[in-house]
Amino acid sequence: MNNWVTTYENHNYGLVISSRIRLARNLAKIPFSHKLNIEESKKVIKNVENAFYTFSNTEEKFKSNYLWDKNDNEKNIYLEKHLISKNLIDNSSKAAFILDDKETISIMINEEDHVRIQCITGGLNLEEVYDVSEKIDDLLEENLEYAFDEKLGYLTACPTNVGTGLRASVMLHLPSLSLNNQINGFLNALAQVGMTIRGLYGEGSKAIGNIYQISNQVTLGRSEEEILSNLKALVLQIINQEIISRENLMKKYKYELEDKIYRALGVLKSAVLLNSSECLKLLSDVRLGVEMGIIKDVNGITLNKLLVESQPATIQKIYGESLSNKDRDFNRAKFVREKLAVNTA
């Protein structure tokens, strides 16, 4: 399974940035995470580690990370890479995660549930990430007793996760639908089929840079295969709508669209100050140009990397010091200029 940041698939016009699976699990006869004190939570962590690291090669390929040992910037870097959730960070005093060396598998411990198995990769590859997450789940279940009800399925802290405990999501770049204000029209339609649309960092986040996450909202009464099949079909429909919208834009406003795209590239190559929001918006315009074949000398993987590396915590780490907002904006602009200079012809 490839790291989504270093993967750029031309299938579906490059619109699909990543596919992710999360499986919510809880240990039997133990209260949910929010009911546990620090000592009890650390026992859960130890139980999960003992169950996982008994298998061969796991200690060589995986590493435990304890959030109480990390500073805020380190935690936010993992969040910016989509490796952990905001909820896990909120539980820092009693939370941990096990991460593989390719940064594609993350087992979050003491988030909303005792265990959240997450697998993420590039492109529209829901079946692949589900297969990997299911294998991890089976390994853990060999040594852990899960909270499971014969009628309801897996028991979870949030009622919407009861059942399969499966949350599948696909991250999409939808600039044309955003520009035409068509995203809101999808909200009601998605809700009616048990799906939802969120921003770049999931629940409660904004769709900065025209990046959206489409995911299932309900797991009870539906099989894993049904959830994945429905989500994939829906994503393909949305991709088709985005492509049609782009074609219409190109027909009606060809010069204006090309001007917008090349101006964005020009600003990114020459700006002295860039805040994170402006940077993501400009990167979206350039990504649109790459996806439509208008810009031919920018690498799609470079844009994926900049999507992460231009974020506040990662910029702070790259320049190795506590930066003021203005200094961070200065260094972000410098970093983007240098990356685009190297990765353009």
Curated annotation (Swiss-Prot):
Keywords of the record: Allosteric enzyme, ATP-binding, Kinase, Nucleotide-binding, Transferase
InterPro entries, per database record: Arg_Kinase, ATP-guanido_PTrfase, ATP-guanido_PTrfase_AS, ATP-guanido_PTrfase_cat, Gln_synth/guanido_kin_cat_dom
Domain of life, source organism: Bacteria
E.C. no: 2.7.14.1
Annotated ATP binding sites: 18-22, 82, 116, 167-171, 198-203
Activity regulation, free text: Appears to be allosterically activated by the binding of pArg-containing polypeptides to the pArg-binding pocket localized in the C-terminal domain of McsB.
Short sequence motif named RDXXRA motif of the pArg binding pocket involved in allosteric regulation, residue ranges: 328-333
A Pfam cross-reference name: ATP-gua_Ptrans
Phosphagen kinase C-terminal domain mapped to chain residues: 15-245
Family of this protein: Belongs to the ATP:guanido phosphotransferase family.
Its biological purpose: Catalyzes the specific phosphorylation of arginine residues in proteins.
Protein name: Protein-arginine kinase
UniProt organism field: Clostridium kluyveri (strain ATCC 8527 / DSM 555 / NBRC 12016 / NCIMB 10680 / K1)
